[in-house]
Curated annotation (Swiss-Prot):
GO terms for cellular component: chromatin; PcG protein complex; transcription regulator complex. It is found in: Nucleus. PROSITE patterns: ZINC_FINGER_C2H2_1, ZINC_FINGER_C2H2_2. The keyword Repeat applies. This is Oocyte zinc finger protein XlCOF2. Disulfide bonds: none annotated. InterPro entries: Znf_C2H2_sf (IPR036236), Znf_C2H2_type (IPR013087). It holds the Pfam family zf-C2H2. May be involved in transcriptional regulation.
Length: 157
């Protein structure tokens, strides 16, 4: 029926199924309930853990890269969101993040009027009108309208 009764209180996105809603909420909560027994790395979705487990070298990579990641994460982040306290390295990142709280959607589709908080989301959406699928999987050749869909798909190979 197209009904989407589950609404995210953080960003306003709607979902048809509770499972989709729960998975989405992990973006905001940072919850990662699935963990690798070998290296302890945590994942927000079971399929990410399964992908990780199918690539054993990733565990060693993770352990060696952990120090690099920690140093990367220690980069100064002087721009703080007054709503939730999240910090950013650039003021433009903070500004973009704050749209989640304000609901500001300054990028509108000329075709249907649907509005988006970011330019990239609008560009992805516009591909649904044109039918253009500019993102191609190098493994199997399957094409996608959105880069995120391609990235998600590539995890199955």
């Amino acid at each position: 029926t197209g009904e989407k009764p589950f609404t995210c209180t953080e960003c306003g996105k709607n979902f048809s199924f509770t499972t989709s809603f729960i998975r989405h909420m992990r973006i905001h909560t940072g919850e990662k309930p699935y963990s690798c027994a070998d290296c302890g790395k945590h994942f927000s979705e079971k399929m990410y853990l399964q992908f990780h487990q199918k690539n054993p070298s990733e565990c060693e990579e993770y352990v060696t890269l952990k120090a690099t990641l920690q140093s990367h994460q220690s980069v100064e982040k002087p721009f703080t969101c007054t709503e939730c306290g999240k910090c950013f390295s650039l003021s433009s990142y903070l500004h973009r993040h704050q749209r989640l709280h304000t609901g500001d959607r300054p990028f509108s589709c000329a075709e249907c009027g649907k509005a988006f908080s970011g330019k990239a989301q609008l560009q992805d959406h516009q591909n649904t009108h044109t039918g253009e699928k500019p993102f191609t999987c190098t493994e199997c050749g399957k094409c996608f309208t959105r880069k995120g869909s391609l990235q998600m798909h590539q995890k199955i190979h």
